């Protein structure tokens, strides 16, 4: 069989159906070689290899005559979906992912199945067959986020798709929600550092200015440039975004400085005007007093 692993159903039952996992600390790299019989049989035809895997797995799930028949094997359900997906048969993949999602068990695999259902619907194959493909895909992405709110992959897909579809309000909302999610250290299934290191920051930087949030866009693009975790082919575009934000912030700073100086000048002019008015009032009072003194003197003489 294929895609098998060591399992302990009794122990897993004590953990709400989830796998019992331990970790080996440190940084490791696995050197994987595909030199087995399956690879030799199909050579460079990866798609055919995956579809053959899918056929084997479906047989194990549906054919009672199959020696590996296990209709309730969650692993077979999941990898039937995976194999159809990698083989480019997205409608079949969708159906098997749905079965795996409904089956329950390991939460990460269940979550990923719902997430993959959305990706299936976004394929050219299913977009041609499903008039409301995006509505359904978006529902699955939101469901996936609801299942594991500390996984940001669905939010990235939502943000990017809405940006490309000219929906900046929604793109901004999802990118802003996702950019604060930290890398899920305790998860193990299909983790992408890129999502958490730079892709969500990039999406936020791409749409923040459209929402008038130049300050947040500047923070996002500044962090991208400072950390430099993106692939080199994205450097020029990201640098251009940063330059635009930087120029805007500089213009804002200059404008604010100008406003401060103008306010200071107005204050000084108003102060001078008040002082002039005060002096005029003092002069008028002095003149009035002198005039009064003169009148009093004249009255005294006339007596």
Report each predicted region and the residues it spans.
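Start-of-helix register in tetratricopeptide repeats
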Residues: 75, 108-112, 153, 194, ...
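Catalytic-site signature of metal-activated, phosphate-bearing donor transferases
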Residues: 1-92, 248
């Amino acid at each position: 069989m294929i895609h098998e692993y060591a399992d302990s159903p009794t122990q897993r039952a004590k953990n709400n159906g989830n796998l019992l996992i331990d970790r080996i600390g440190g940084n490791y790299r696995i050197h994987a070689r595909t030199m087995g019989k399956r690879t030799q049989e199909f050579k460079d035809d990866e798609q055919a290899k995956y579809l053959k895997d899918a056929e084997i797995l479906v047989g194990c799930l549906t054919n009672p005559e199959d020696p590996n028949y296990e209709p309730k094997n969650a692993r077979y359900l999941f990898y039937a979906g995976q194999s159809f997906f990698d083989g480019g048969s997205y409608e079949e993949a969708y159906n098997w992912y749905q079965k795996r999602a409904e089956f329950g068990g390991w939460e990460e695999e269940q979550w990923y199945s719902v997430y993959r259902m959305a990706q299936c619907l976004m394929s050219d194959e299913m977009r041609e067959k499903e008039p409301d493909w995006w509505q359904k895909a978006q529902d699955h992405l939101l469901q996936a986020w609801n299942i594991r709110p500390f996984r940001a992959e669905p939010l990235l897909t939502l943000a990017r798709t809405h940006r490309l579809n000219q929906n900046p309000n929604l793109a901004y909302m999802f990118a802003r929600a996702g950019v604060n999610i930290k890398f899920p250290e305790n998860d193990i299934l299909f983790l992408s550092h890129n999502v958490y290191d730079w892709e969500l920051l990039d999406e936020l930087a791409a749409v923040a200015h459209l929402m008038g949030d130049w300050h947040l866009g500047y923070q996002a693009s500044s962090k991208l440039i400072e950390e430099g975790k993106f692939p080199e082919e994205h450097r020029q575009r990201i640098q251009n975004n940063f330059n635009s934000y930087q120029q805007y912030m500089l213009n804002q700073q200059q404008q604010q400085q100008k406003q401060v100086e103008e306010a200071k000048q107005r204050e000084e002019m108003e102060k001078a005007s008040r002082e002039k008015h005060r002096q005029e009032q003092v002069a008028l009072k002095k003149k009035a007093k002198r005039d009064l003194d003169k009148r009093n003197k004249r009255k005294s003489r006339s007596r």
